[in-house]
Amino acid sequence: MATASGAGRVSEPPSTAFAATGLRPLAIGPADRPADPARGEHALLVAGIGDMVITDDPAAGLVAYGLGSCVALAAWDPATMTAGLAHFMLPSGTSGGGPVKFVDRGLPAFLAAFEARGGSIRRACFKVAGGAAMLAIHASSLGIGRRNAEAVTAAMAARGLTFVATDLGGTVGRTVQLDASDGRLHIRSVGRASVI
């Protein structure tokens, strides 16, 4: 069963929003019933800003739309087919927001939820994307994207965890989709598509 953690919701983007990403489309079931794999339909779980989604359904896709300075951390355990995606907004903080709004508090929560769902962080393949400098002012003074990328990298290293692939920095936003069947992270930005 594919579920989103945190609020316990499963969300599907409007079909036009998904089509605009250019990612490999997944067939989504109508809103009035669950996706039916027999019909070629699969769950699409959306990690909004400050949110995470975790599933043990290998037919699911996990997506984070419009990463600018935000960073998405993908985790996939090939033994249990557990997949997770966290959408971090800031390196640290204490104000409200979703369960993974801040890297410093959100990364431990994400890793704990991933393991609670059946994944092993020692066996998992981790990938990270985002952390762009969207505006010249951000690149020169605030550096939120760079700081987000550094915070995730440092927090993972402090736990002895490494990335098998990264797509960080730059000056354009990204949309990412984690394929729960094989751990591939599809990345789409203006004028570019890649898989890591």
Show the residue positions of the predicted features.
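Active-site microenvironment for binding and transforming phosphate-containing groups
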Residues: 1-196
